[in-house]
Amino acid sequence: MSYRMSRAAYANMFGPTVGDKVRLADTELFIEVEKDFTTHGEEVKFGGGKVIRDGMGQSQVTREGGAVDTVITNALILDHWGIVKADIGLKDGRIAAIGKAGNPDMQPGVTIIVGPGTEVIAGEGKIVTAGGMDSHIHFICPQQIEEALMSGLTCMLGGGTGPAHGTLATTCTPGPWHIARMIEAADAFPMNLAFAGKGNASLPGALVEMVLGGATSLKLHEDWGTTPAAIDCCLSVADEYDVQVMIHTDTLNESGFVEDTIAAIKGRTIHAYHTEGAGGGHAPDIIRICGQPNVIPSSTNPTRPYTVNTLAEHLDMLMVCHHLSPTIPEDIAFAESRIRKETIAAEDILHDIGAFSIISSDSQAMGRVGEVAIRTWQTADKMKRQRGRLKEETGDNDNFRVKRYIAKYTINPAIAHGLSHEIGSLEVGKRADLVLWNPAFFGVKPDMVLLGGTIAAAPMGDPNASIPTPQPVHYRPMFGAYGRSRTNSSVTFVSQASLDAGLAGRLGVAKELVAVQNTRGGIGKASMIHNSLTPHIEVDPETYEVRADGELLTCEPATVLPMAQRYFLF
């Protein structure tokens, strides 16, 4: 006779199952388990008196015979494709299977074989997500990378050379010499990294040189002159060599207006950074381009979400980041032209309806590298409180909204930049770059971060203690962050053209160099999962009011946010 457990007892032992709901941190977002791949009564769990023991849940199968390297048991997977309960098998640094783990000699329906060579990570009661991707990085200081890793990011894409003034303001690694030095430096970090070259040129020669030097993308920035000629030249090179282009348009409208930029793009795929405009772009109506089918629009996190403090902090932030002086009236006017409460409020709603596709940081250059996930979920929470349930929801939960928002910093930036064949989602065959979360700390403080199947970071107590938990507990690099494990657990992304030109042999770096692919005509706004809406956007040039398909987009600023001070008392 089978043993019956209450739902509460079952969830406490094995984690939630179908129909159970989980609150995300202290938000008003609730997810519900849609499917359970495990078998009730045949669950595997590690520990004294538990299932994963020799001859029970652990088989005699060798690694060569099919046993996985690592199993994450009874995890609640949260990804763009679903919210499901499953065991996760990892092998050779990749996701080998999502299903039912155990001993096929003793248990039915086993799709993930646990053997003597299998390590166990207890996923009971934990949420597992794909590692986050930040697609707007100013590489101003290397310490950003550890900050990002400890927040749950496993891939960073952008440009820079350190605290040079070009890098402080723009997301570019200019020239093949600097790109080579950054690719060499990447060996030192437990993080997947990708570098963008400078895209501002009216002739292609120097841009081709950077792509052949390893640039995965080219960045057009107004501080270098984002003219129609530069836009056209940059996109022409990108189309020839299959790299993405990111654009920060002309705030001052010196070389043209938003219509001129759209005309210069000529329908070609482009990633529009901080499309709302506070981070830079045609004032006051750059936000209009989010309705273009070839434009992939993104946000940087200081405007996420719109709060009572957003406007005030942006003015000071902008003066520092763009080398402006508070004693020069023209500089003050430039700064004030970029900060508009009406477009920032509209940005909240455009994210909620899926018209803005990506959220990134703009690290140390009007953005916070460790708050990509936090700001994303704060925006989702604010929108639920102000706008209620989304019409796409099918149950008494927030599953669709949560899938929409997690896609903004996982799969969508990966698709936009040609990395989705390797990273961006928790799917079989992709790199095992995973983040485990205690639901109470979801999006704020990870429980564990894996890179290429190895544990790279985790909160850890006193190393001299008799157990791992005594205070002080803080985030520390783990074994995956050291030695050759570090260089074998993460990769550096480059262009295919650079690999064909022998870049790996010339630089002799330890990390694998992996080519980006399908960044041009094969993708566009329609490729952005759960975030592909293309409304017709209008901006009143005098009041800055924003309308989408004729509807006024406005909301109140938040006065209180979740995932904030109560999580950072210490």
Curated annotation (Swiss-Prot):
<dbReference type="InterPro" id="IPR005848">
    <property type="entry name" value="Urease_asu"/>
</dbReference>
<dbReference type="GO" id="GO:0016151">
    <property type="term" value="F:nickel cation binding"/>
</dbReference>
<feature type="binding site">
    <location>
        <position position="274"/>
    </location>
    <ligand>
        <name>Ni(2+) 2</name>
    </ligand>
</feature>
<dbReference type="Pfam" id="PF01979">
    <property type="entry name" value="Amidohydro_1"/>
</dbReference>
<dbReference type="InterPro" id="IPR017951">
    <property type="entry name" value="Urease_asu_c"/>
</dbReference>
<keyword id="KW-0479">Metal-binding</keyword>
<feature type="binding site">
    <location>
        <position position="136"/>
    </location>
    <ligand>
        <name>Ni(2+) 1</name>
    </ligand>
</feature>
<dbReference type="InterPro" id="IPR011059">
    <property type="entry name" value="Metal-dep_hydrolase_composite"/>
</dbReference>
<dbReference type="GO" id="GO:0005737">
    <property type="term" value="C:cytoplasm"/>
</dbReference>
<keyword id="KW-0378">Hydrolase</keyword>
<feature type="active site" description="Proton donor">
    <location>
        <position position="322"/>
    </location>
</feature>
<feature type="binding site">
    <location>
        <position position="221"/>
    </location>
    <ligand>
        <name>substrate</name>
    </ligand>
</feature>
<dbReference type="InterPro" id="IPR029754">
    <property type="entry name" value="Urease_Ni-bd"/>
</dbReference>
<dbReference type="Pfam" id="PF00449">
    <property type="entry name" value="Urease_alpha"/>
</dbReference>
<feature type="binding site">
    <location>
        <position position="138"/>
    </location>
    <ligand>
        <name>Ni(2+) 1</name>
    </ligand>
</feature>
<dbReference type="InterPro" id="IPR006680">
    <property type="entry name" value="Amidohydro-rel"/>
</dbReference>
<feature type="modified residue" description="N6-carboxylysine">
    <location>
        <position position="219"/>
    </location>
</feature>
<feature type="binding site">
    <location>
        <position position="362"/>
    </location>
    <ligand>
        <name>Ni(2+) 1</name>
    </ligand>
</feature>
<feature type="binding site" description="via carbamate group">
    <location>
        <position position="219"/>
    </location>
    <ligand>
        <name>Ni(2+) 1</name>
    </ligand>
</feature>
<protein>
    <recommendedName>
        <fullName>Urease subunit alpha</fullName>
        <ecNumber>3.5.1.5</ecNumber>
    </recommendedName>
</protein>
<dbReference type="GO" id="GO:0043419">
    <property type="term" value="P:urea catabolic process"/>
</dbReference>
<dbReference type="GO" id="GO:0009039">
    <property type="term" value="F:urease activity"/>
</dbReference>
<dbReference type="InterPro" id="IPR011612">
    <property type="entry name" value="Urease_alpha_N_dom"/>
</dbReference>
<keyword id="KW-0963">Cytoplasm</keyword>
<feature type="domain" description="Urease">
    <location>
        <begin position="131"/>
        <end position="570"/>
    </location>
</feature>
<comment type="pathway">
    <text>Nitrogen metabolism; urea degradation; CO(2) and NH(3) from urea (urease route): step 1/1.</text>
</comment>
<keyword id="KW-0533">Nickel</keyword>
<dbReference type="InterPro" id="IPR017950">
    <property type="entry name" value="Urease_AS"/>
</dbReference>
<dbReference type="InterPro" id="IPR032466">
    <property type="entry name" value="Metal_Hydrolase"/>
</dbReference>
<comment type="subunit">
    <text>Heterotrimer of UreA (gamma), UreB (beta) and UreC (alpha) subunits. Three heterotrimers associate to form the active enzyme.</text>
</comment>
<comment type="similarity">
    <text>Belongs to the metallo-dependent hydrolases superfamily. Urease alpha subunit family.</text>
</comment>
<feature type="binding site" description="via carbamate group">
    <location>
        <position position="219"/>
    </location>
    <ligand>
        <name>Ni(2+) 2</name>
    </ligand>
</feature>
<feature type="binding site">
    <location>
        <position position="248"/>
    </location>
    <ligand>
        <name>Ni(2+) 2</name>
    </ligand>
</feature>
<dbReference type="InterPro" id="IPR050112">
    <property type="entry name" value="Urease_alpha_subunit"/>
</dbReference>
